[in-house]
């Protein structure tokens, strides 16, 4: 029977009043203590049969948590939170610990994560020993660990990739609580109300129940930053470009030496700002990029077996993924082009026009929307790095009293994209502008020039925008706020200054906000590290989605500690939705199981 003592049998049969089935038993059913060998769990008619493969531990409470895995066979209605407990000794441990696991960065509930406890309070227990008691989170991120004995515990979260019940791989997502967990239970009273009708109370009944604490543990899960440095991949996607991909950012460029070509001034290197993990090399020299195979040595910093950065040199052979065309294919292309040219000339003669061979231009994508935001700017993105820029051929004009007049602007290379340039100007609200670039203003490294460009646009007026101002309390001295759209994507970021986070010139729409306590002041969210007992930087959500209208200001008071973390993120922003509510079984079914 449930709660049996001195049990020695490894095969357990639970019988129900009607035919049942199991839904995803491998995912939903959790057994404590965790089993090294996977148990066999089957449904058969009105029965569930569990066969444990591990040797039973003496004087141990075993709990089998079915979550909502048991369903009636006809309609699939779940039996919620069904559990089964027995002991191999003379005492059964009956306390429980509950809580919620959230993604530390965006406070999303985390489904299917293992949560475990250790009575061994050493930090090394999490990285060397299997959990003693375990639970698993549901679609709301909620977990319950049952069959807990009195005492002090450490609690952890783990996405257990290798199913060994401890943290053994740096790629595993983890969580840990700084404070000790001390389970307890007490008797409490609740009141159930019986109604005569929708307006009249019949009876208020008092019911005693057992309350288990703590039931509000919050675990913020994260993945540690992988600092192991190695070359993941090298490739040459086209003859004129090759790339290197590293597993972690570095502070300096690797040293490249050509073995069948001269590398001196042979490349333009496209790299992100700051620390480097992805490098694109554009080959300048046509004699080099026409080679089928590029042989080179690459010296870079590599993490050795002692976790130290040491120089390492790899010899590489890079072959273009695009197959070079054969002489026969090139000859066919030339013949086809000559035929098309002759056809175009004859057509021009027939129409009495002079034939002009079309010019091939360097492609450029110009971002200059017809309606320009006050804070926005023009950008030009090219398909290859530029060899030259003629600044004098770029013109920005404002329409003043029906005349187009030149206005000052800054033309600046983009800090993140080698092939993008930005045009900044102090826009006059509500005014019209034209942006023009003469032909041949830009030349790519492979010789092509750009065509002329002309874009006209009008700048929005201030009354087309709204503003949101947050009065923030409870934040650290270094904090910033991300303004979010309805899809939880960052629209804009501002620092918290004098307990204020102000957002100006916002387009009408729905917004929410996320605050990050930026402990190291680097302007980005940083993950945690278990070895250093460093939690990820704290994230808090404003609890509402705000609807902003044009020409309207919203001022919101925001105490980041007003609500528990699991109650902060607005439901409409959450991507992890609770499983669809199903019709629940009669609660009497909870007690209908009999052990045989």
Named regions from a protein language model:
Residues 1-596:
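N-terminal targeting or signal-anchor segments and their processing/structural boundaries
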């Amino acid at each position: 029977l449930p709660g049996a003592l001195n049990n020695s049998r490894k095969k357990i049969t639970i019988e129900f009043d009607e035919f049942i089935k199991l839904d995803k038993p491998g995912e939903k059913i959790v057994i404590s203590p965790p089993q090294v060998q996977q148990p066999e769990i089957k449904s058969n008619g009105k029965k569930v049969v569990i066969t444990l493969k591990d040797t039973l531990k003496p004087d141990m409470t075993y709990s089998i948590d079915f979550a909502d895995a048991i369903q009636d066979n006809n309609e699939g209605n779940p039996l919620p939170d069904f559990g089964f407990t027995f002991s191999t000794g003379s005492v059964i441990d009956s306390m429980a610990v509950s809580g919620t696991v959230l993604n530390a960065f965006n406070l999303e509930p985390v489904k299917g994560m293992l949560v475990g406890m250790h009575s061994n309070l050493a930090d090394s227990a999490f990285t060397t020993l299997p959990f003693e008691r375990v639970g698993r989170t549901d679609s709301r991120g909620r977990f319950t660990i049952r069959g807990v004995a009195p005492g002090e515990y450490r609690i952890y979260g783990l996405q257990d990739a290798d199913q060994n019940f401890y943290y053994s791989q740096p790629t595993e997502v983890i969580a840990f609580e700084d404070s000790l967990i001390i389970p307890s239970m007490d008797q409490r009273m609740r009141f159930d109300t019986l109604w005569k009708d929708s307006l009249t109370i019949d009876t208020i009944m008092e019911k005693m129940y057992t309350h288990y604490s703590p039931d509000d543990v919050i675990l913020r899960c994260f993945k540690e930053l992988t600092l192991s440095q190695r070359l993941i991949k090298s490739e040459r996607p086209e003859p004129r470009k090759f790339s290197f991909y590293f597993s972690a950012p570095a502070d300096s460029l690797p040293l490249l030496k050509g073995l069948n070509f001269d590398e001196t001034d042979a490349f333009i290197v496209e790299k992100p700002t700051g620390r480097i993990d992805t490098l694109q090399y554009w080959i300048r020299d046509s004699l080099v990029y026409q080679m089928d195979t590029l042989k080179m040595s690459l010296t870079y910093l590599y993490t050795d077996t002692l976790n130290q950065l040491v120089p390492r040199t790899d010899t590489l052979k890079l072959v273009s993924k695009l197959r070079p065309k054969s002489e026969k294919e090139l000859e066919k292309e030339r013949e086809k082009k000559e035929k098309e040219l002759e056809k175009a000339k004859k057509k021009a003669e027939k129409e009495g026009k002079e034939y002009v061979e079309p010019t091939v231009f360097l492609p450029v994508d110009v971002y200059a929307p017809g309606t320009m935001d006050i804070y926005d700017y023009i950008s030009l993105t090219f398909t290859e790095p530029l060899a030259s820029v003629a600044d004098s051929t770029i013109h920005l004009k404002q329409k003043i009293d029906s005349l187009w007049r030149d206005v000052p602007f800054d033309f600046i290379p983009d800090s993140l994209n080698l092939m993008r340039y930005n045009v900044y100007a102090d826009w006059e609200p509500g005014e019209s502008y034209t942006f023009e670039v003469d032909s041949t203003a830009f030349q790519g490294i492979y010789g092509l020039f750009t065509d002329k460009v002309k874009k006209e646009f009008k700048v929005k007026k201030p009354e087309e925008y709204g503003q949101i101002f947050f009065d923030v309390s409870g934040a650290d001295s270094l904090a910033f706020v991300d303004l979010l759209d309805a899809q939880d994507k960052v629209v804009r970021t501002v620092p918290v200054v004098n307990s204020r986070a102000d957002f100006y010139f916002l387009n009408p729409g729905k917004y929410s906000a996320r605050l990050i306590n930026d402990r190291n002041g680097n302007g980005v969210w940083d993950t945690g590290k278990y070895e250093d007992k460093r939690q990820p930087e704290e994230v808090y959500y404003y609890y509402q989605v705000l609807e902003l209208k044009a020409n309207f200001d919203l001022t919101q008071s925001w105490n980041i500690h007003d609500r528990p973390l699991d109650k902060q993120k607005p439901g409409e922003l959450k991507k992890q939705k609770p499983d669809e509510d199903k019709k629940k079984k009669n609660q009497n079914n909870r007690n209908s199981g009999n052990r045989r």
